[in-house]
């Protein structure tokens, strides 16, 4: 029976469809022996086994060009067959590692589901992956894939919507092969074997790496270096495209990250972005995008360093004499400056880059290019890892080789401008401001904080301020479209870090007003909420320090600037009894404060008296009785000087329970096997004790003085270990470094009220407990045992 005409036409034109797909399709096929691949001039070479030196290159390595039609390109199977002798299936070859029947999925099988996987006999040796028509003697070889150190293997993974088989993808220089098997164990066996063969291969080198080695060996002979540049255009500036990366990058089919192409394709795109810099009206965002790509794909950092060294060498070789003042020429140097302040180049690339900069300085000592070269050399010596790429303001400053100006807000001193560079740390800025304000001999410790409204977080001493400014810029751009964005954005501020020492403050220095303003800011945010009489006394002292003696002719003060905002009363339903966290059994006993149970029993006996008092204290923000009480206390302070009022304010505020306590959201990890899931808790660090409480609760569940803390150390990226006696508490938080620094600061600062670390004593008194609950949920804490003379004077 004759076949239908349409089927005859399909069979006869199958070869024609393949050629059309090769010429006008995606450029790469993965059929049985019909793979079409791009021709590349850059051959990869294996280093000589003897190692060491090589003779000078006699051949000229040029940038690959595409002059002929696409149909004239070499086919992948022709290239691989030229490397392997044409022979049949080997018999008992000792180099065979794995062999067996597998399915090979045609390229584009997901897009063309009618192309079914083809079954073939695969043999893996130490040099290649071969495909045969059968497993018998004399079987015809259908194709080969040469395995090098740059090949990559992905999988196994199952594709239920396509083939339903387990697949392993092997990516080579020209094409990739997807091996399929119905059994997962077999796919895993092939994947492991392929990875072991690739890992055993010697690393390959590109011609660019060989030329870099020649330049390094001839660095003492300028004429030899110039000759290498003249004979090899790949090292010089070019206006044409780059079709292959300068460094050996792994062959991959899958993208290394969301929004990115494979590494080799991204390297070519980077070079196109560099060339786009020459005509860009706003080069800053384009530079930032290039830096972000290198930040997301670290394998491209050395590649970009080499591309910039190539483009800054000039068409005739280094140092690039033509049009040194041309902005298009300088933009390569500006991007290289940003790169040197963000990333650290590898060994060979770093040596070549330093040599390139040195040759530029020697050839053009008084030019602007030499200034850029000197700036970059200094930056390479100081650069370490960056968390974020430079901000647009930093890129603009680096393009002019200038420092960046940042503003730090200091209580009592206003905004202080500080000049920083890409390597300045938060500790260096804090030390500079401490010295500028005359606080170097103070007993109090200070640190740099990032602040936004009531949110604040201490910066570790080694944090780069440039990264913090970049984060502020990103947050500002994200919140630009929000309608309910806050009035004040993120800012840097200098504040007290650790325990407060109000005694012995000089009335003439900056420390007294500094601490005075910071204490007032903490009280306005409800940290901590003092009793009603203490609040009124503090308000009167602040009025005396700001306006001196009371005058009936003056305007009435605004109490909302003197007292914390009122808390709306609400009924709290009785909460059920919760299961205690692991720390209840772990840190129970004499180490934890026994005063907690006594205070709970006392408050239960009084039956909510403290809560009503707290409402009175907080609601008194604008009442007539509160205003009269504050004004009455202000009148009784007549004759008190400004410095004396500030000192009395600090002394009274320091007696408030939990004054200056820092709070952190943590996860408590169980130290017992099978102890359960981590529990969310709130860690409070006060001047004399630390406490743990549940989120939203005002009463701490545990408290321990610093004298009982034996050690505080990091045991993981976000895990902190606190050793209390013979027990250990594990806490997890993204701010573990800040917590550890603050705890160690308290541990290194003994005081007469705090028990010694080596001694044993009872828990801290009530005012030593840190405050760990949100400001809107505070109850009034008990009045401190001792009151200053100023408070007694106000109550008389």
UniProtKB/Swiss-Prot annotation:
Matching SMART domains: B41, MyTH4, PH
Glycosylation site residues: 474
MyTH4 domain span: 237-399
Biased composition regions of type Acidic residues, renumbered to the chain: 29-41
Signal sequence extent: 1-18
Residue ranges occupied by any PH domain in the UniProt entry: 95-199
Annotated segments matching region Disordered: 28-71, 557-584, 598-625, 750-796
Residue ranges, compositional bias (Basic residues): 598-608
PROSITE patterns: FERM_3, MYTH4, PH_DOMAIN
One annotated Gene Ontology cellular component of this protein: cytoskeleton
Pfam families in UniProt: FERM_M, MyTH4, RA_2
InterPro entries recorded: Actin_motor_Myosin (IPR051724), Band_41_domain (IPR019749), FERM/acyl-CoA-bd_prot_sf (IPR014352), FERM_2 (IPR035963), FERM_central (IPR019748), FERM_domain (IPR000299), MyTH4_dom (IPR000857), MyTH4_dom_sf (IPR038185)
Modified sites of kind Omega-N-methylarginine: 638
Keyword Signal: yes
Modified residues (Phosphoserine): 30
Keywords tagged on the record: Glycoprotein, Methylation, Phosphoprotein, Signal
Regions of compositional bias (Pro residues) in chain numbering: 563-583
Domain FERM: 404-757
Compositionally biased intervals (Low complexity): 757-766
Compositional bias per record (Polar residues), positions renumbered to this chain: 59-68, 774-796
Matching PANTHER family: AGAP003327-PA, PLECKSTRIN HOMOLOGY DOMAIN-CONTAINING FAMILY H MEMBER 3
Name of the protein in question: Pleckstrin homology domain-containing family H member 3
């Amino acid at each position: 029976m004759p076949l239908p005409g349409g089927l005859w036409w399909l069979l006869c034109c199958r070869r024609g469809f393949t050629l059309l797909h090769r010429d006008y399709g995606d450029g790469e096929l993965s059929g049985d022996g019909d793979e079409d691949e791009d021709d590349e001039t850059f051959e990869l070479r294996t280093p000589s086994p003897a190692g060491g030196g090589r003779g000078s290159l006699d051949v000229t390595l040029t940038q690959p060009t595409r002059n002929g039609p696409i149909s004239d390109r070499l086919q992948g199977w022709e290239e691989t067959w030229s490397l392997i002798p044409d022979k049949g299936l080997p018999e008992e070859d000792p180099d065979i590692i794995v062999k067996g029947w597998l399915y090979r999925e045609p390229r584009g099988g997901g897009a063309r589901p009618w192309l079914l996987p083809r079954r073939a006999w695969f043999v893996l040796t130490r040099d290649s992956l071969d495909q045969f028509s059968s497993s018998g003697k004399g079987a015809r070889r259908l194709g080969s894939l040469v395995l090098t150190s740059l090949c990559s293997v992905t999988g196994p993974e199952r594709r239920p919507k396509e083939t339903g088989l387990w697949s392993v993808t092997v990516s080579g220089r020209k094409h990739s092969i997807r091996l399929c098997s119905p059994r997962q164990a077999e796919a895993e066996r092939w994947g492991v074997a392929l990875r072991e063969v690739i890992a055993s291969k010697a690393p390959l080198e590109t011609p660019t790496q060989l030329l870099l080695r020649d330049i390094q060996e001839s660095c003492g002979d300028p004429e030899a270096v110039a000759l290498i540049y003249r004979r090899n255009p790949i090292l010089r500036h070019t206006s044409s495209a780059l079709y292959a990366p300068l460094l050996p990058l792994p062959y991959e089919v899958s993208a290394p990250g969301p929004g990115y192409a494979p590494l080799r394709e991204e390297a070519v795109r980077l070079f196109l972005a560099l060339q786009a810099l020459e005509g860009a009206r706003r080069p800053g965002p384009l530079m930032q995008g290039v830096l972000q790509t290198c930040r997301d794909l670290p394998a491209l950092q050395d590649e970009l360093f080499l591309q910039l060294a190539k483009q800054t060498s000039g068409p005739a070789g280094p140092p690039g004499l033509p049009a040194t003042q041309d902005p298009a020429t300088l933009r390569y140097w500006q991007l290289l400056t940003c790169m040197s302040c963000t990333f650290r180049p590898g060994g060979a690339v770093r040596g070549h880059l330093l040599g390139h900069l040195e040759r530029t300085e020697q050839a053009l000592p008084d030019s602007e290019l030499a200034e850029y070269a000197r700036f970059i050399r200094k930056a390479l010596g100081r650069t370490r890892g960056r968390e974020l790429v430079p901000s647009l303001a930093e890129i603009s400053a680096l393009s002019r080789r200038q420092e960046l100006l940042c503003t730090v807000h200091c209580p009592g001193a206003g905004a202080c401008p500080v000049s920083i560079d890409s390597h300045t740390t938060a500790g260096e800025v804090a030390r500079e401001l401490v010295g500028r304000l005359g606080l170097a001999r103070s007993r109090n410790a200070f640190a740099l904080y990032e602040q936004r409204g009531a949110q604040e977080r201490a910066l570790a001493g080694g944090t780069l301020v440039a990264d913090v400014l970049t984060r502020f810029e990103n947050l500002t751009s994200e919140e630009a479209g929000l309608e309910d964005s806050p009035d004040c954005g993120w800012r840097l501020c200098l504040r007290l870090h650790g325990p407060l020492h109000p005694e012995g403050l000089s009335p003439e220095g900056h420390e007294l007003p500094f601490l005075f303003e910071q204490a007032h800011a903490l009280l306005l945010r409800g940290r901590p909420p003092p009793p009603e009489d203490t609040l009124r006394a503090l308000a009167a002292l602040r009025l005396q320090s700001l306006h001196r003696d009371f005058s009936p002719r003056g305007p009435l003060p605004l109490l909302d600037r003197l007292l914390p905002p009122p808390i709306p009363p609400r009924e709290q339903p009785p909460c059920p009894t919760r299961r205690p966290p692991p720390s209840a059994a772990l840190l129970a006993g004499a180490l934890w404060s026994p005063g907690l149970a006594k205070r709970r029993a006392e408050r239960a006996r009084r039956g909510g008296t403290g809560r009503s008092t707290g409402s009175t204290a907080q609601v008194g923000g604008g009442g007539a009785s509160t205003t009269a009480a504050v004004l009455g206390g202000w009148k009784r302070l007549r004759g008190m000087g400004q410095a004396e009022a500030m000192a009395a304010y600090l002394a009274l505020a320091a007696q408030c329970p939990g004054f200056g306590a820092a709070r952190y959201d943590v996860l408590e990890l169980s130290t017992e096997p099978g102890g359960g899931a981590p529990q969310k808790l709130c860690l409070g660090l006060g001047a004399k004790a630390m406490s743990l409480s549940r989120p939203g609760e005002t009463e701490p569940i545990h408290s321990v003085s610093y004298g009982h803390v034996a050690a505080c150390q990091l045991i993981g990226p976000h895990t902190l270990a606190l050793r209390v006696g013979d027990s250990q508490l594990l806490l997890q938080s993204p701010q573990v470094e800040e917590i550890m620094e603050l705890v160690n600061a308290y541990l290194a600062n003994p005081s007469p009220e705090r028990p010694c670390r080596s001694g044993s004593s009872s828990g801290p008194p009530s005012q030593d407990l840190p405050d760990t609950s949100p400001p809107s949920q505070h109850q009034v804490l008990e009045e401190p045992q001792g009151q200053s003379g100023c408070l007694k004077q106000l109550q008389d």
